[in-house]
C-alpha cells in the first residue's frame, strides 16, 4: 500500500510526463523528378564533369541530404528536382535506389525517374556524342556460361540463358530480371520532345568517328535516337561480343528490341523500382532511361579489340560530349515535367485529348 505522502509526488511526476512535448515527424518532401546518375569524377562542381556535375550546377541542386550510400543527395526545393549518384554497377544502383525509395524523408509516389548516364554505343547504330532513349533494358549477367574452348562444336557461344539447354534456346522461361520494358508511350514522348535537340560536335569526335569506315551511322555527327540498352557488370569490348550483345537483346525482347548502348546499372535500378512500385512508394511507369555515347563498343576496322579497349581506358573520346548531351537532353524533359506539374503530377505524358 502507498503511503499518503507518496501520492502527491507520483501525481506530480505523471503530470510532468503528460505535459512533455511530443516529437513531430516532418512531412515528407514531395519530389517531382529524380535524376539518377552513376558517377562523378572529382568534386560536384568546378572541375572535370562526370554524370552528376552539370545537374548539380545548372539545376541548382543546392540542398544536401546525407545519404548512407555512395554519394549524398542534392535537392532543389523550388523545382522539386532531386539528384543522386548511385555508384557504378548494378549492385550499387539497385541498393541506392532501394534505399532512396524507402527513405521516409521523401514522397516519391508521383515522382518521375530519369536515368541519365553515359554508355558504349554500337557503331552500327550511332556515333559517339549521340543520345538514345531506351524502351527495353536487358541484363547481360544472368546466364549460364561454359568456356568457349569446351562448348559443343555447333554452339555459337558458351553463354546462354538460365533454365535453358543451349544458346538462344527458343524455349526460354519468362524473364525474371533478364529483361524489363519501360512504358513505351512515355519513352516515345521523351524522344519526340528531344529529337531536334542539337548535340555538341568537335574535331576530336570527327577524328574518332572517321576511322569507322563502313559504319555510316558511326560516322554521323551526334544525333538523337531510340535504342535499347544492355546492362552488365563486365566492361566488355570487341566485334564478337558486340554481335553477342545484339543477339542477346533480340533474344530477350523477342526481336522487338535493338541493342544500341552498353552500360552497367539500368536493370539493377529498374529491378528495385519494380519492388518499390509494389509497395506504392514509386510508380515504375514513370521511368525514363537516357544513355549517351562516350565510346564505341568495338574497334574500327584495322585495330584489335585489345588495342582499342586499352586506348579507351586512358579516356573516353566522347566523355565531355556525352556528359553534356545527357544534361542537354535530360533537362528538356525535366523542365517540361516540372513546368507543367499541375498536369503531370496526376497524368503521365503523353496527354490524350
Which residues does each predicted region cover?
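Bacterial N-terminal signal peptides
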Residues: 5-16
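Accessory terminal and edge-of-domain segments that mediate assembly/interaction
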Residues: 19-353
Amino acid at each position: 500500500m502507498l503511503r499518503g505522502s507518496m501520492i502527491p509526488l507520483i501525481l506530480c511526476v505523471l503530470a510532468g510526463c503528460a505535459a512533455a512535448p511530443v516529437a513531430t515527424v516532418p512531412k515528407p518532401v514531395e519530389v517531382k523528378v529524380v535524376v539518377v546518375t552513376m558517377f562523378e569524377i572529382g568534386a560536384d562542381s568546378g572541375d572535370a564533369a562526370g554524370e552528376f556535375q552539370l545537374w548539380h550546377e545548372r539545376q541548382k541542386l543546392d540542398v544536401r541530404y546525407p545519404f548512407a550510400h555512395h554519394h549524398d543527395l542534392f535537392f532543389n526545393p523550388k523545382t522539386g528536382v532531386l539528384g543522386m549518384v548511385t555508384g557504378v554497377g548494378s549492385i550499387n544502383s539497385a541498393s541506392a535506389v532501394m534505399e532512396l525509395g524507402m527513405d521516409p524523408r521523401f514522397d516519391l509516389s508521383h515522382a518521375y525517374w530519369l536515368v541519365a548516364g553515359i554508355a558504349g554505343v554500337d557503331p552500327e547504330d550511332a556515333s559517339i556524342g549521340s543520345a538514345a532513349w531506351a524502351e527495353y533494358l536487358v541484363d547481360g549477367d544472368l546466364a549460364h556460361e561454359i568456356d568457349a574452348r569446351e562448348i559443343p562444336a555447333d554452339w555459337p557461344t558458351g553463354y546462354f540463358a538460365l533454365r535453358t539447354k543451349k544458346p538462344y534456346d527458343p524455349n526460354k522461361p519468362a524473364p525474371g530480371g533478364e529483361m524489363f520494358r519501360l512504358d513505351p508511350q512515355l519513352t516515345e514522348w521523351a524522344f519526340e520532345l528531344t529529337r531536334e535537340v542539337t548535340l555538341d560536335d568537335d574535331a576530336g569526335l570527327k577524328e574518332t568517328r572517321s576511322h569507322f569506315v563502313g559504319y555510316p551511322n558511326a560516322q554521323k555527327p551526334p544525333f538523337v535516337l531510340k535504342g535499347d540498352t544492355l546492362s552488365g557488370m563486365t566492361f566488355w569490348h570487341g566485334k564478337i561480343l558486340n554481335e553477342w550483345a545484339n543477339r542477346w537483346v533480340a533474344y530477350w525482347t523477342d526481336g522487338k528490341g535493338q541493342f544500341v548502348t552498353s552500360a552497367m546499372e539500368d536493370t539493377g535500378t529498374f529491378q528495385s523500382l519494380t519492388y518499390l512500385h509494389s509497395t506504392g512508394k514509386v510508380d515504375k511507369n514513370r521511368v525514363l532511361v537516357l544513355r549517351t555515347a562516350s565510346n564505341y563498343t568495338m574497334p574500327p576496322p584495322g585495330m584489335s579489340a585489345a588495342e582499342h579497349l586499352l586506348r579507351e581506358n586512358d579516356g573516353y573520346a566522347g566523355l565531355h560530349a556525352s556528359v553534356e548531351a545527357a544534361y542537354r537532353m535530360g533537362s528538356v524533359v525535366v523542365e517540361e515535367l516540372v513546368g507543367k506539374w499541375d498536369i503531370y503530377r496526376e497524368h503521365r505524358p503523353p496527354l490524350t485529348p
